[in-house]
């Protein structure tokens, strides 16, 4: 089996995380997984949604979108259609769930964190790149809250979160699929993990042929290997 990119089966794409990418957001990152590029921002606003009022905890919510020409052919803006598509809703819920797992909301205070992930170029793995980049932006946003005198109850950050895709391509497990691989893969799996080794979410679909338990175990092992490298990259970016 030869991957279109020439990478080894267990090799990630080149990953870059650029912090403080935009001027106004409390946390902002440009994350690049190969040719997939996503701008992730975290905005801080006082107050919480109505369903959390009086409960003494904060909240985090996420939105996701793609520029019309992030892909090979132009896609109509969802705003011009008047509603978000099912894929968009699914992905932004995944991003929100994943990042909430990083936080102790009771220590966040009366604050809502708005995570915005905007894909400027797509070549597979946009949701996993979004989670990975937004996590770094979230850490920076928490630092800003603390500088402003917030987080009186302590640090709400419990653990780092990252995500990566794995799949079965031509009968073999591969790590971090690009678009060519993703479109031809027999199985596509998105894995979200914590820096302590726990799983937050595993989303998997057999596109061409059913995958077997041994295949699943092999894909998860690949994801764990890749995640170790991604957490190192996140930490290196935050150390700059």
From Swiss-Prot:
CDD domains in UniProt: RNase_PH_bact (cd11362)
PANTHER family assigned: EXOSOME COMPLEX COMPONENT, EXOSOME COMPLEX COMPONENT RRP41
BP term (GO), one: tRNA processing
Keyword Membrane appears in the UniProt entry: no
Keywords carried by this UniProt record: Nucleotidyltransferase, RNA-binding, rRNA processing, Transferase, tRNA processing, tRNA-binding
Protein name: Ribonuclease PH
GO molecular function terms noted in the UniProt entry: 3'-5'-RNA exonuclease activity; tRNA binding; tRNA nucleotidyltransferase activity
Pfam families per UniProt: RNase_PH (PF01138), RNase_PH_C (PF03725)
Oligomeric form and interacting partners: Homohexameric ring arranged as a trimer of dimers.
Family annotation (HAMAP family): RNase_PH
Family the UniProt entry places it in: Belongs to the RNase PH family.
Entry EC number(s): 2.7.7.56
Gene (UniProt): rph
Catalyzed chemical reaction(s): tRNA(n+1) + phosphate = tRNA(n) + a ribonucleoside 5'-diphosphate
Ligand binding (phosphate): 87, 125-127
Function summary: Phosphorolytic 3'-5' exoribonuclease that plays an important role in tRNA 3'-end maturation. Removes nucleotide residues following the 3'-CCA terminus of tRNAs; can also add nucleotides to the ends of RNA molecules by using nucleoside diphosphates as substrates, but this may not be physiologically important. Probably plays a role in initiation of 16S rRNA degradation (leading to ribosome degradation) during starvation.
């Amino acid at each position: 089996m030869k991957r279109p990119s020439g990478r080894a089966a267990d090799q990630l794409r080149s990953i870059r995380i650029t912090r403080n990418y935009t001027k106004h957001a409390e946390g902002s990152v440009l994350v690049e997984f190969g040719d997939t590029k996503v701008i992730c921002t975290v905005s801080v606003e006082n107050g919480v949604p109505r369903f959390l009022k009086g409960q003494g905890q904060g909240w985090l919510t996420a939105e996701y979108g793609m520029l019309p020409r992030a892909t090979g052919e132009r896609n109509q803006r969802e705003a011009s259609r008047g509603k978000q598509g099912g894929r968009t809703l699914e992905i932004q819920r995944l991003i929100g769930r994943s990042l909430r797992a990083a936080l102790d909301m009771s220590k966040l205070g009366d604050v809502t964190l708005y995570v915005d992930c905007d894909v400027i170029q797509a070549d597979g793995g946009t949701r996993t790149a979004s989670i990975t980049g937004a996590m770094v932006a979230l850490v920076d946003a928490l630092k800003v809250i603390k500088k402003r005198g917030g987080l009186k109850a302590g640090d709400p950050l419990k653990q780092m979160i990252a995500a990566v895709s794995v799949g079965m391509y031509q009968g073999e497990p591969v790590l971090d699929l690009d678009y060519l691989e993703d479109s031809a893969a027999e199985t596509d799996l998105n894995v979200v993990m914590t820096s302590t080794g726990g799983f937050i979410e595993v989303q998997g679909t057999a596109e061409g042929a059913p995958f077997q338990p041994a295949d699943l175990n092999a894909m998860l092992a690949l994801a764990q290997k890749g995640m170790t490298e991604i957490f190192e990259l996140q930490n290196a970016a935050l150390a700059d």
